[in-house]
Amino acid sequence: MMKDVTPGMIFSDILRSGTPDATAWIRGNAQNPQLSGVVRFYSTPYAGVLVETEVFGLPDNATQFSSNFYGMHIHENGDCTLPFSKTGDHYNPTKAEHPHHAGDLIQLMSNQGYA
């Protein structure tokens, strides 16, 4: 019996044994010093990118004006110094309408500050 190879199986293998093509570190600021994490980007055989994200120290839904869902996107520039005036727009090489920019990623769902 032949076993079909699914994209999920390939993605699992990439995460288990692959080397990221790029890595971005997440770190907090004076207002949110508890934030930290890492985002890893892997090439796939499907002409796309697999994004692995791990974030610690997110405010949970007990924090005023917070929820357990956090938007995630990539900006044109990597300068995240306050007040974020040098980050540029969301990465959008095809000039797509929001929320279909290439840099608009799926939301993170946090559980007790971890996503």
Question: Locations of the language-model features?
Answer:
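N-terminal leader/targeting pre-sequences
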Residues: 1-115
